[in-house]
Amino acid sequence: SVGFKAGVKEYKLTYYTPEYETKDTDILAAFRVTPQPGVPPEEAGAAVAAESSTGTWTTVWTDGLTSLDRYKGRCYHIEPVPGEADQYICYVAYPLDLFEEGSVTNMFTSIVGNVFGFKALRALRLEDLRIPPAYIKTFQGPPHGIQVERDKLNKYGRPLLGCTIKPKLGLSAKNYGRAVYECLRGGLDFTKDDENVNSQPFMRWRDRFLFCAEALYKAQAETGEIKGHYLNATAGTCEEMIKRAVFARELGVPIVMHDYLTGGFTANTSLAHYCRDNGLLLHIHRAMHAVIDRQKNHGIHFRVLAKALRMSGGDHIHSGTVVGKLEGERDITLGFVDLLRDDFIEKDRSRGIYFTQDWVSLPGVIPVASGGIHVWHMPALTEIFGDDSVLQFGGGTLGHPWGNAPGAVANRVALEACVKARNEGRDLAAEGNTIIREASKWSLELAAACEVWKEIKFEFAAVDTLDR
């Protein structure tokens, strides 16, 4: 007779363990589970734990060759989602041994691999992860972090200002460099390659890098401030990406850029290691994130992608604006902004934070607010994001009626006015418009910007909201 009982058995017999006490070394996950009709939540939660760890659809005799108790994921708690008929938050604990050290790629392949196509579930979303210090210690994390970046740039006590060069595609390298120069000369700290500017027929990467470096040095000489342009090193292969980063370093520029979701975590971590070894800051763009994170009942929440980026490595990451043209509810956004910047974050469900997270010694990441923002938003942005942020105005700089440099001047004047008002103890939320109006009296550039954008608002309800 065979030494094991063949056949299909319910997942919950093995993988649903409500009595389990989580360990300090476990990776904990909170999944929003929508089971198919007729599937009980315990079975659905156990199925998630099984399929994302050691389980398969039937009993196999090789299970007897290892200790499932030691290696299996466990669904240890289930709670119904308030206001939703058939959604549950299922908490799963994974033993640390299931994951390769220092590999975000491997962590995601396990936790959000096959399980998302699982038939017993109508939908599945990974809401949050608790990464234990034991695992965090296997990652280098951001190449430099917030304090080192401020020291490199010699800029303190205020948010940094950026601008994405538009039109994003179609400019020649020389005209592109000209726009970079004008913006930096006008008072911005950074300009930025758009995420889809890589190396296209109208502007090859090497030409762009050269003209942007020239613009950078010229603007630095004229303003006496350190300037940066995020040179997008994203490429079709890792080797090509590193080649571009090497060239950027040879030009002596301070910062490069990567599209971390389309480029992939393996490429991103390689680039982050190169950047730390060679003194380059690394700006991260999140192109493709909304494909993954925008639906409320399926996918991965951005706070998880943000945590993953902090582990993989990046000094800046785009994180929504709360006030512009792109998705982002205030409390949720501030929740993952804190996850990016702070060393220790308490569990706080009102901001979507399911677990207390201790980052031990991993440097912080600066959140970048970008997308449909302009001078009238400056008080709100200063109030919401605080000093450790980059505020990025693309159209809000280049769309100025007098041109790029005056657009940059308007933004810098508005920012300095808001920081000054805040430092004097004024309430930016209540007096924001007044502060901007006062400042525009002694800056014609700001007055012109105020006139152009006084009516623009992007008023749509957020799709991804807190559960009430």
Swiss-Prot record:
Quote one Gene Ontology molecular function term: magnesium ion binding
Which metal ions or organic cofactors does this protein require, according to UniProt? Mg(2+)
Q: Which positions bind substrate? A: 114, 164, 168, 286, 318, 370
Q: What is this enzyme's catalytic activity, as reactions?
A: 2 (2R)-3-phosphoglycerate + 2 H(+) = D-ribulose 1,5-bisphosphate + CO2 + H2O; D-ribulose 1,5-bisphosphate + O2 = 2-phosphoglycolate + (2R)-3-phosphoglycerate + 2 H(+)
According to its UniProt entry, this protein's organism is Tecoma stans
Output the superkingdom of the source species: Eukaryota
Against PANTHER family, the record matches this protein to: RIBULOSE BISPHOSPHATE CARBOXYLASE, RIBULOSE BISPHOSPHATE CARBOXYLASE LARGE CHAIN
UniProt keywords, alphabetically: Calvin cycle, Carbon dioxide fixation, Chloroplast, Disulfide bond, Lyase, Magnesium, Metal-binding, Methylation, Monooxygenase, Oxidoreductase, Photorespiration, Photosynthesis, Plastid
Q: Name one GO cellular component term.
A: chloroplast
One Pfam family linked to the record: RuBisCO_large_N
Name by which UniProt lists this protein: Ribulose bisphosphate carboxylase large chain
Q: Which residues form the active site?
A: 166, 285
Q: How is the cofactor bound?
A: Binds 1 Mg(2+) ion per subunit.
Biological processes annotated in GO: photorespiration; reductive pentose-phosphate cycle
Provide the assembly information: Heterohexadecamer of 8 large chains and 8 small chains; disulfide-linked. The disulfide link is formed within the large subunit homodimers.
Please give the InterPro entries that the UniProt record associates with this protein. RuBisCO, RuBisCo_large_chain_AS, RuBisCO_lsu_C, RuBisCO_lsu_C_sf, RuBisCO_lsu_fd_N, RuBisCO_lsu_N_sf, RuBisCO_lsuI
Which residues of the sequence carry a binding annotation for Mg(2+)? 192, 194-195
Q: What HAMAP family would the database entry show?
A: RuBisCO_L_type1 (MF_01338)
* Other comments on record: The basic functional RuBisCO is composed of a large chain homodimer in a 'head-to-tail' conformation. In form I RuBisCO this homodimer is arranged in a barrel-like tetramer with the small subunits forming a tetrameric 'cap' on each end of the 'barrel'.
In its record, the post-translational modification comment is: The disulfide bond which can form in the large chain dimeric partners within the hexadecamer appears to be associated with oxidative stress and protein turnover.
**Is Oxidoreductase among the key words of this record?**
yes
- In this chain's numbering, which residues are marked as the site (Transition state stabilizer)? 325
Q: Where in the cell is it found?
A: Plastid, Chloroplast
**List-wise, which residues carry N6-carboxylysine?**
192
Group of enzyme by EC:
lyase
